[in-house]
């Protein structure tokens, strides 16, 4: 029984998390400023269609809880997205300025035009700039849950977390799987050198 407890305690020491509530505006600003890497090598590309993006935006407007965004802290203090690329990219696609670096990072020049909304039908066919200023401010100030894996955590944990959080979602392409494995091997090699 003591072996079980010591194994659990040893593994728990490898993981160190922090939790935050951050506004949509803060997150977009952090991506713009290069403080959040929205597409680390092991992460999938932005794939959600307009309907799925619109449903997320509607949920945020309505105050319906959305899953936390999971980030890993790099040694330089920047964050990289472990889980939530689709959600964060959708938010950027809807609310980021047209010529912003955040929009360029998701490779979407034309802002999301909401569609298929069932609760907020009058929002359909509108983009962020078409909304009244009060609604724009309301959206930008909405808080989202952020969980960050600190840089004190074992480097292999971020790949374990990525795998656990992404099981059952949109299937990774063969190239995304290869990128994840290659990045994991590089991190493992770097960790061995440390």
Predicted regions and their residues:
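N-terminal leader or domain-start segments enriched in small/polar residues
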Residues: 1-79, 93-111
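Non-catalytic, well-ordered alpha-helical scaffold segments
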Residues: 25, 54, 89, 155-159, ...
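Short, charged/polar micro-motifs that form catalytic or ligand-binding hotspots
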Residues: 46, 81, 147-151
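General alpha-helical segment detector with a strong preference for membrane-spanning helices
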Residues: 87-88, 194
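Short amphipathic C-terminal alpha-helix that caps PH/PH-like domains
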Residues: 88-91, 95, 161-166
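Internal, well-ordered alpha/beta segment that forms a basic, Gly-enriched binding/recognition surface
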Residues: 103-186
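Conserved small/polar residues in nucleotide/adenosyl-binding loops
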Residues: 187-194
